[in-house]
Amino acid sequence: MSGNRDSILPPLEWLSAQHPPAPAAVSDWLMEPGSMTRRFERHCGRVHVEPQRECFVTRDQLGEEAEHLPDSPRYWLREVVLLGDNQPWLLGRTVIPLETLTGPDLALVDLGTLPLGRYLFSSDELTRDYIHIGRQDALWARRSRLRLAGKPLLLTELFLPASPLYATGSSVPE
């Protein structure tokens, strides 16, 4: 389990190879290689972001997330609710080491209501190291370590009950 008591995200259980795989339709969403924002836009008229928390934090405030990022004096933390047609679809938490916030990527601290995916996937220098699949009761989650010009950031996404991920008929939360 992972969780930060100050986070908008509840504790998440990250699944290992021993866990049963996600249903194929759900896995298709969770393993999405492109922008989740763009994928959501295909299922609604309007996607928008409501920032919940944006601030610098220290490594000891990250909990187990620190294992996925290099040591840094500070990390930029951004927590948001992403909505499709005014329905909350996703909770997002981004942790960015100070060293990633250089040059044009310093703009990451000023995204405000701009979806992170719009910024990240406009870069020719974006790569993804991995996607981990997780659960929180009946809800699905994913965690990705991404790199901008080789510099890391960690993105955790929890798909809320109204998310189109569950509209496939597979693993619809109650």
Swiss-Prot record:
**Which pathway is recorded for this entry?**
Cofactor biosynthesis; ubiquinone biosynthesis
* UniProt EC number: 4.1.3.40
Q: Please list the residues that bind substrate.
A: M36, R78, L116, E157
Name the catalysed reactions.
chorismate = 4-hydroxybenzoate + pyruvate
Under SUPFAM superfamilies, the record lists: Chorismate lyase-like
Cellular component GO terms held in the UniProt record: cytosol
Q: Top EC class per UniProt?
A: lyase
Q: What is its main location?
A: cytoplasm
Keyword Plastid present in the record's keywords: the answer is no
Protein's GO biological process: pyruvate biosynthetic process; ubiquinone biosynthetic process
Q: Which domain of life is it from?
A: Bacteria
What keywords tag this UniProt record? Cytoplasm, Lyase, Pyruvate, Ubiquinone biosynthesis
Q: From the Swiss-Prot or TrEMBL record, state where the protein is found.
A: Cytoplasm
Q: Does the keyword Repeat apply?
A: no
One of the entry's Gene Ontology molecular-function terms is: chorismate lyase activity
Q: Where does this protein have coiled-coil stretches?
A: none
Which interval of the chain is the signal sequence?
A: none
Sum up the protein's function in the record's words.
Removes the pyruvyl group from chorismate, with concomitant aromatization of the ring, to provide 4-hydroxybenzoate (4HB) for the ubiquinone pathway.
User: NCBIfam families, per this entry?
Assistant: PRK11655.1 (NF008656)
User: What family is reported?
Assistant: Belongs to the UbiC family.
Q: How does it assemble?
A: Monomer.
What is the designated name of this protein? Chorismate pyruvate-lyase
Which lineage ranks, top first, belong to the organism behind this chain? Bacteria, Pseudomonadati, Pseudomonadota, Gammaproteobacteria, Enterobacterales
The gene name reads ubiC
